[in-house]
A protein has these predicted regions:
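Blade-loop segments of beta-propeller domains
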Residues: 52-58, 72-74, 80-117, 123-125, ...
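Beta-propeller blade signature
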Residues: 82-92, 172-183, 220-227, 280-308, ...
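Repeated scaffold domains used in trafficking and secretory/extracellular systems
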Residues: 52-59, 103-113, 145-156, 194-205, ...
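Residue-level signature of beta-propeller blades and closely related beta-rich strand-turn architectures
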Residues: 25, 73-75, 126, 166-167, ...
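Beta-propeller fold detector
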Residues: 19-23, 95-100, 138-144, 185-191, ...
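Conserved beta-propeller blade signature
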Residues: 18-20, 66-69, 119-121, 159-161, ...
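Short, conserved, GDST-rich strand-edge loop motifs in beta-rich repeat architectures
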Residues: 69-80, 164-171, 265-297
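Beta-strand-rich domains and repeat architectures in extracellular enzymes and scaffolds
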Residues: 4-82, 103-110
């Protein structure tokens, strides 16, 4: 299987932009397709801040100068909604804004992506919206599960793949596929064997086959996408959670880079327990200061699984502190062979050199 860089060229299905989706593209490599800031001697960066009193989740880029902000209601708001804004690149002020978009009552960070057809697709709660570049709603779809969904993948046929998030062990996470014109559902939902919290990633191999990677509570799975359907790859099912739940909890998102599926464990924390204690999610929200307090006693760990062989699972412990937690994927620089791991709960960041022959070597910690 061949690993490419999302930043090398236009991604099939995605708009021709330096940053058309969260993490920069479906492999979640977080590398922008741009030459950098090109700051010269005597030049400097200045900062501009705008506060809108809402939960600002992410930004994506469309044409040059077009920046779109996805957000949703403030945690204390009685109205549960999402929104899309086109913002000025210098002042950050709103140029145009969608109406408040119903979320089915859920408060959770969704996602936004720019499709190669020029439209933007927004997910908030259990709704999906299609919007034009002026933030006007073109189509909307209530999704099948009474659950929050966490963002999209765009496949090369233009379809959207989504998954609902489930914290409870006895709940089912399911894939749903929507066509991009009217947001009609394509085929039946596909159930995942374990509840899943993290966002999905996608890779394309040298034969052009698309693989969707999804974290389960104990196991990472991948599904082959073909003819608008998803089929579980039973030859690749690495089990990463090997300790009891008091010691180790689930993974969130993965980064697909340089022949590996990279992810962190210990994703559970006090915020999750509070947010997912109600349905719709987020009716009760955690007290400030408790959000990132981890529930697992084992220190944060970084994993790499070879995408050709799930038996080649490597793990390293970058930090020594307990009760850490994470919400996001690690990063791996395939040029310099450096992995970036973190522990949000304890405020730690580390860089680790990796080679397939020698494994991990810690370079620094902050």
């Amino acid at each position: 299987m061949h690993i490419n860089l999302d930043s090398n060229e236009k991604i099939k299905g995605y708009y021709d932009s330096p940053w058309p989706a969260e993490c920069g593209g479906p492999r979640r490599q977080k590398i922008p397709r741009s030459p950098g800031l090109n700051i010269s001697n005597g030049e400097y960066l200045s900062q501009k801040t705008r506060a809108n009193g809402e939960w600002n989740v992410m930004m994506v880029l469309r044409d040059p100068g077009e920046v779109f902000l996805l957000g949703n209601n403030h945690s204390n708001s009685t109205e549960k909604y999402g929104f899309l804004e086109k913002i000025d690149t210098y002042s950050l002020e709103c140029i145009s804004r969608s109406p408040n978009l119903p979320s089915g009552g859920h408060t959770w960070c969704g996602g936004v992506v720019v499709h190669e057809n020029g439209y933007l697709y927004l997910n908030n709660g259990n709704y999906c919206y299609k919007l034009d570049p002026d933030c006007k709603v073109v189509a909307s779809k209530k999704l099948p599960q009474n659950s929050a969904y966490n963002s999209f993948l765009i496949m090369k046929d233009g379809n959207l793949v989504m998954k609902n998030i489930e914290h409870a062990w006895d709940a089912k996470s399911k894939f749903v596929i929507l066509e991009p014109e009217f947001l009609n559902q394509v085929a039946d939902e596909v159930a995942i064997d374990e509840n899943s919290m993290g966002r999905i990633a996608m890779d394309i191999d040298t034969q052009g086959t698309q693989w969707v990677y999804v974290p389960g509570r104990d196991t990472f799975f991948r599904y082959k996408y073909e003819k608008a359907s998803l089929t579980l790859d039973q030859s690749w099912m690495p089990k990463y959670r090997t300790l009891n739940y008091e010691e180790q909890s689930f993974s969130w998102d993965a980064c697909i880079s340089d022949g590996g599926c990279w992810f962190l464990d210990n994703g559970d924390n006090r915020a999750n327990v509070t947010i997912f204690s109600t349905r719709p999610f987020g009716q009760d929200l955690p007290a400030r200061g408790s959000v990132f307090q981890g529930l697992s006693s084992s220190p944060q760990k970084l994993f790499r699984v070879d995408i050709k062989n799930d038996k080649k699972l490597e793990v390293v412990q970058p930090f020594d502190k307990q009760r850490g937690s994470i919400f996001s994927p690690p990063a791996f620089d395939p040029i310099h062979k450096v992995a970036i791991a973190f522990d949000t709960g304890n405020g730690l960041l580390a860089g680790l050199n990796y080679s397939k022959d020698l494994g991990f070597k810690k370079l620094w910690e902050k």
